[in-house]
Amino acid sequence: QYAQQIIDKYNNATDYGCSDQGKDKTICIDYSSPNVAKNFHVGHLRTTIIGNSLYKIFSKLGYKVVRINHLGDWGTQFGKLIVAYKKWGSREAVEEKGIEELMDIYVKFHEEAEKDDSLNDEARAWFLKMEQGNEEALEIWQWFRDISLKEFMRVYNILGMEFDSFAGESFYRDKTADVIKRLTDDGLLKESQGAMIV
């Protein structure tokens, strides 16, 4: 009988479990955060469910909750993917199979790079083009990103989830010059395989 009372109270009240503990406070939750051009796997699903649960709990406690999905959408893996696409991919296959095709050619890249290390040099060169704003490189990258987001949104829609921010790693690509200058001025950068590292 007690359990039924709790169930009835919960079903008939929209404020069950609510408080104003978080009034005038903001909390940011960064969750899900899948990698672009890769499958949405169980590890992403776990953090997605946990993050969304935390969002619901903090919202009920009166917090303003900012839901952040920090996508893995920038980095040398895109140089590898561009090389793979140009060597073994086709627009038709990517349009038809989406992320599955991108994963297939990415795996092919790694298999071939074990036999031919020059592929890694090509990949670094393509990523450098991306960083320098090369139109072709950025167009291919954006296409890969759009295909991935379409698939991610399909999953989020099934789960009934929304986010306040989808800004991924690429958001910061034009904001790092000041940080790099400071690291350079402080003597903290060194060159390694054509890249500057800390």
Regions found by a protein language model. Give the residues of each.
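NTP-dependent nucleotidyl-transfer catalytic core
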Residues: Q1-V198
